[in-house]
Regions:
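Short alpha-helical segments that sit at the start of domains
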Residues: 1-20
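Short coil turns linking two alpha-helices in DNA-binding domains
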Residues: 46-47
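DNA-recognition alpha helix
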Residues: 30-43
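Short amphipathic alpha-helical elements of helix-turn-helix/winged-helix folds
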Residues: 20-25, 37
Length: 138
């Protein structure tokens, strides 16, 4: 019984460490980045464990999973906001503009009740426009 409790505690510690890694970065990392970050404090954690826990955290609304260009990125900011994806450097930026007016207009026009708004804009970021670089932060 003590072994089971210890195992569950370990899973909880792993999940909290994974959650912390996602929430404490401004980038929108993929599972491999999270795995490398978590390994700094938990060297024995497997990539499979990170994938499973990211899935559980996303399913429970503790983080958001963002699908773009065939890859899943994770976002620790769960409040409604928009994203901008730079097609040159493949960086995802948070856009923190109020979308209440937009949501309100859509609700008025359609008579739907909107509970979540997912907006992904694509283009070339300011840095890439000036530097023509292909480096992303995650």
């Amino acid at each position: 019984m003590a072994q089971v409790k210890n195992l569950m505690k370990n899973f909880s510690q792993q999940r909290e460490t994974i959650l912390s890694a996602v929430r404490n970065t401004r980038c929108h990392p993929r599972a491999e980045w999270v795995h490398n970050k978590v390994k700094e404090t938990m060297p024995n954690v497997s990539l499979g464990t990170v994938y499973r826990n990211l899935g559980v955290l996303a399913e429970n609304g503790r983080i958001n999973a963002i699908q773009i260009e065939g890859a899943t990125h994770y976002d620790g900011v769960t409040e409604m906001h928009q994203h901008f994806y730079c097609t040159a450097c493949e960086t995802i930026y948070d856009i923190e503009l109020s979308n209440k007016t937009f949501v309100s207009k859509v609700e008025q026009k359609t008579k739907h009740h909107i509970t979540e708004s997912l907006v992904m804009m694509k283009g070339i970021c300011e840095l890439c426009q000036t530097q023509k670089t292909k480096e992303n932060q995650c």
